[in-house]
Amino acid sequence: MKRLILAAAILATACQPATTTTAAPPAAPAAAEMPPVTIYHIEGRRSERIVWLMEELGLPYELKFTRGNIGESMAAIRAVNPGMPVAPTVTIGDQVLTESGAIIETIINRYAPGKLTPPLESADYANHMIWMHHAEGSLASRVIADYRVWMIKPPTARSPLVDSEAEVQFAEDYLATHPWFGGAEFSAADIMMVFPLNFAMQLNIVDKNQFPSINAWKAKIEQRPAYQAMLAKARPDGIPGSPPALPQHAPSGPRPAPALPAAQPAQPAQPAKPAQQ
């Protein structure tokens, strides 16, 4: 009888549905203690991104530039970073950093882990990372190159290659279905994308009226208190020495198909040479 009871208990246990537990996502690592941060800045340059980042995070920093004097601001940068005098040049303790995207990721990962970044396991994280790097790797490089060429020779037709309008349209299409470049929430990717999109639109590289989703996104950006604080501190008098807008941008419309190289005619086969005796 005892054996029958034991067998029934084992059978009942085996027939119970299996339960699974979902592990909670790992907690963000603790923030490291932040040494003094100094941002060497020139008005209207990418160093604005770092000022804006620090305002969003509520972290302390020192901002160094000579108001309205690009030459003196650059001299201060050269004194700290003679090998690569660019804005931004940022010192964190005794370390000198350049490249705004790298500076942003370093500050967030060390001193504000989990902030302005979607959760690692989310779908938004991959999109956030794409736009973090697309801002300079694809968008800025394209619009700046087109600006320089078109200032010398205004365009009369769309390029068959990926041109500035195609780059900006790519961002427009994404924002048509997402509120921010970070996906559902504002992220550091939005900080990265403002500079090249402003450059493209304010300098008439593209027709700004063609991109309603970008314009709506920019309006939200401009209402953020941290962005307004950045403008007041980093651009109090506008942008000295701002480049002129293009007299005309490329016509709108589809890009022409790239021309394929002409096929080369087949060469007639050469008769085999007789073997040498």
Task: Describe each model-derived feature in a short phrase.
Residues 132-223:
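GST-like fold's C-terminal all-alpha helical module
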Residues 21-32, 255-277:
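Compositionally biased, proline/threonine/alanine/serine-rich low-complexity intrinsically disordered stretches
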Residues 234-261:
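Acidic/histidine-enriched, glycine/proline-rich intrinsically disordered or flexible terminal extensions
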Residues 22-158:
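GST-like domain detector, emphasizing the conserved glutathione-binding G-site
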Residues 2-7:
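Sec-dependent signal peptide recognition
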Residues 12-14:
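C-terminal motif of bacterial Sec signal peptides marking the signal peptidase cleavage site
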Residues 39, 54, 90, 171, ...:
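Residue-level signal for nonpolar/aromatic packing positions in well-ordered secondary structure
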Residues 16-18:
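Bacterial signal peptide processing site
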